[in-house]
Amino acid sequence: QMISKTMIFEEVALALQGSDMTQEQIRQRVEDTLKVCGLYPFRNWPISALSFGQKKRVTIASVLVQQPELIILDEPTAGQDFRHYTDIMEFLRGLNEQGVTVVMITHDMHLMLEYTPRALVFCDGQLIADRSAAAVLCDPELIEPAALKETSLFTLANRCGIAPAEDFVERFIHEDREVRTHGC
């Protein structure tokens, strides 16, 4: 919906048109960005030939080509199946490891637990928490005022008498990720 060009290369280069960069500098920057986004092999393809997840990466590449220090994404995995959800989140994790700050707005509590080292919670326009995702989602004093949902892992920890629940949730998410990633 935010794509305005037909071809991948043209779409990513669009933000640099009219800058003081030469065409060669633009070409190099776009190619470098497409490599980071895993789209370089498709650089001369029409955008219509891409999957939904690849199209999302094109829109992200269109921002990254400008070399921002920060990107803000609203529901980056909305409408994607689990495979594409995982692909886009691993891609964003890689960007973050390369020094790009990634801020996500999400209602997906599993995404929040698995992929964010830090969660900011706002209520009535005020910041009410700045902690780990597990700490936020295991704090009944935050869940209600921020209209968050108690996770099933927090409920399980409480019902089984596992304390602190936050540690249990973090360990479970870590183990789940290990099994999916390495099969063990």
State the predicted function of each range:
Residues 13, 24-42:
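Conserved ABC ATPase "signature" region
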Residues 46-50:
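Conserved ABC ATPase signature
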Residues 71-74:
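Catalytic Walker B motif of ABC-type/P-loop ATPase nucleotide-binding domains
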Residues 106-107:
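H-loop/switch region of ABC-family ATPase nucleotide-binding domains
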Residues 112-114:
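A short, surface-exposed alpha-helical micro-motif characterized by mixed small hydrophobic
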Residues 126-153:
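Conserved beta-strand-loop-alpha-helix hinge in the C-terminal portion
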Residues 143-184:
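ABC ATPase nucleotide-binding domains
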